[in-house]
Amino acid sequence: MKKESKYIIQEFSSSIEQSLLEQIYFLNQENTPEVGDLSSIKELQNLLRQSSNNYYVIFKNRIIGFMICFREKSDYNSKNYKFFKKKESKFLYVDRVAINEKYRRFGIGKNLYLKIESIAANNDLPICCEVNTDPLNEISIRFHKDLGFTEVGKCKFDNHSVVYLRK
């Protein structure tokens, strides 16, 4: 993709067209362990029903990226989400961001974050997320620090570890 190529960032919900939902699911699976594994498209739909702000990135009629976010009142059962729910009275939690490997380094991730930064600013919300430290996702850690995120905690799970970030 050339820098001047046009991609579109589109908001979506759990009622998204099935073919687009499938593309998001497969992109998610291609990006594990950087994002959490989903057992099925149905699990993705359940995730979307609980979420608040979701965007996909489309280029030449294919989804090349997406972002799924939650607000503080969700019933989302993620331990990482619950970390922030205990610490913040209100917040916007970035659960997952995935960009097709071919389309990385074109500013897509940054533009997705710009979308939610305006929502966060208009609602006086911190943006919260976690990034893997084991296995190490150094690119994502650097990306978030460059965007102004700071570390607010860490957690070691049985099969991986994360750093918690806030902006």
Where would I find each of the regions flagged by the language model?
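Short amphipathic alpha-helix that is part of the acyltransferase structural core
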Residues: 2-42, 59-64
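Conserved acetyl-CoA-binding loop-helix of GNAT-fold acetyltransferases
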Residues: 99, 105-118
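Conserved GNAT acetyl-CoA-binding A-motif
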Residues: 120-133
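Conserved beta-hairpin
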Residues: 53-71
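Conserved acyl-donor/pantetheine-binding loop and adjacent beta-alpha core of acyl/acetyltransferases
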Residues: 68-96
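A short, internal acetyl-CoA/4′-phosphopantetheine-binding micro-motif in the GNAT/acyltransferase core
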Residues: 95-104, 133-134
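Conserved active-site alpha-helix within GNAT-family acetyltransferase domains
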Residues: 133-153
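C-terminal "cap" of GNAT-fold acetyltransferases
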Residues: 4-7, 154-167
